[in-house]
Amino acid sequence: MIKIERTSKIPKSLEEKRTYNDYDVVMQLKHDFHDKCYICGIKPVQDPEIEHLLPHKNGKFPERMFDLNNLFWSCRHCNSIKNQQKYDENVLDCCQRDPEILIDFTLNGDTVFVQAKDETDIEAVVTAELVNEVFNKTNTGMRVHKCQVRVDELLKEMNALLDTLEKYKTNEHSIIVQRTLKGLLDRKSPFAEFKRNYVKSHQNRYPELIDYIN
């Protein structure tokens, strides 16, 4: 989960309260969220869904249904896992609060571990639990598979970062290496929160790369 800057313009289909998944809404959310699932960070999203941060409960809360600020770009896997009562409230709005400031996103070997930095911040705690679940939930065979797909994709990104950091150690003035690192650490990149957290936690080795974390 990464901080997102929304387009303020309200799509026409939302203004008219026709539907929340018409083409204009889909394209705006896809653009604003960089075609990444806002929960797990996978990119591109092959099975996108428009997720309501606060559920509308089949129209019980109609004001939530067409509120652009309540609509998020999600993959089906994460939307399914978030659809539990414990996540009806207190999941971070990543357009309002910066998850990187509040949560540590770590990959240790092939294990994803996500933890709130402040255990008294209920939104950070609940969000960390949700992100942990989308990478680690094993209650059905399909979820085991889909979690592993995300871990595998995350491993590819982390390995690309580590390989590039090795090249950077021996050739830090290489324009190609610098550009590659900037791309890997950009907010728009897949699983950016994990890669950026790695660099921040090793900034004694790479102090100048903190400038790449935009």
Where are these regions (language model features)?
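Conserved, surface-exposed functional patches that form binding/active-site neighborhoods
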Residues: 86-169
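C-terminal, charged low-complexity interaction regions
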Residues: 132-214
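Ligand/cofactor pocket segment of small-molecule handling proteins
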Residues: 81
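Short, charged surface segments at domain edges that flank catalytic/cofactor-binding sites
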Residues: 1-36, 59-66, 161
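Phosphate-binding glycine-rich loops and adjacent basic patches that engage nucleotide phosphates
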Residues: 32-40, 119-123
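Histidine-centered nuclease catalytic patch
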Residues: 39-73, 85-101
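Phosphate-binding glycine-rich loops of NTP-binding sites
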Residues: 77
